[in-house]
A protein has these predicted regions:
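ATP/NTP phosphate-donor binding region
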Residues: 1-62, 110
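Glycine-rich beta-strand-to-loop/alpha-helix junction loops that act as flexible
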Residues: 13, 65-67, 90-92
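Nuclease catalytic cores that cleave nucleic-acid phosphodiester bonds
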Residues: 62-63, 79
Length: 192
């Protein structure tokens, strides 16, 4: 009998509309069918995914299951390790920009199977003021909206919740920010 590989799933029980802890057994079965012995660890507060992955024992695969924020925390924690782990992501949040980048839909079980049937790829990690990010970074007028929009509104209205928050600031003046950045060794500065 072939030895099972080890997998830790770090999941955010408060992400989006679709993650239900009652389905974790189903996800575990999918992982086992793909040769993984899985352990599930739920996050309890902001920053917890970062703490969890940074203190994990060596394993074959870590899966972040949550929104963009959960994945960003997991990436940040993984970067703090000397022995980085193979990290994957299953999107379960409200917007799931990272999930869209990876080509995922809304069906968690299908996404999990796609991930486990796929191949490991490296991806770029960018850093702004010491803070890693993997998909997009922004600054300026509307950047507070994802953080200010209440979880209750997001669960009730989905994307529309962000629009509701954005309308509140739409007519306020726009401030330009001086920004310096470096890409491939070339530094640029300007007001944006």
């Amino acid at each position: 009998m072939k030895k099972m590989k080890s997998c830790v799933v770090i999941y955010n029980p408060n992400s989006g509309h679709t993650l239900k802890t009652k389905h974790l057994k189903e996800y575990k079965i999918i992982l086992e069918k793909h040769g993984y012995s899985a352990r599930f660890i739920g996050t309890e507060y902001r920053g917890h995914a970062k703490e969890i992955i940074s203190h994990l024992d060596k394993c074959d695969l870590v899966i972040s299951m949550g929104g963009d924020g959960t994945f960003n925390e997991a990436v940040t924690g993984n970067l703090q390790r000397k022995d980085r782990l193979v990290l994957a992501h299953i999107p379960v949040g409200t917007t799931n920009d990272v999930g869209v980048m990876f080509g995922y839909g809304k069906d968690i079980k299908r996404n999990l199977s796609l991930l486990l049937d796929g191949v490991t790829k490296e991806m770029d990690i960018c850093i702004i003021n010491g803070q890693p990010f993997v998909y997009v970074a922004g600054f300026g007028k509307f950047m507070h909206i994802p953080y200010q929009t209440s979880r209750t509104l997001k669960k009730k209205w989905g994307y529309l919740a962000y629009l509701i928050e954005g309308v509140k600031d739409f007519f306020s003046p726009t401030k330009l920010y001086k920004l310096s950045y470096k890409v491939n060794g070339i530094e640029k500065t300007g007001y944006y």
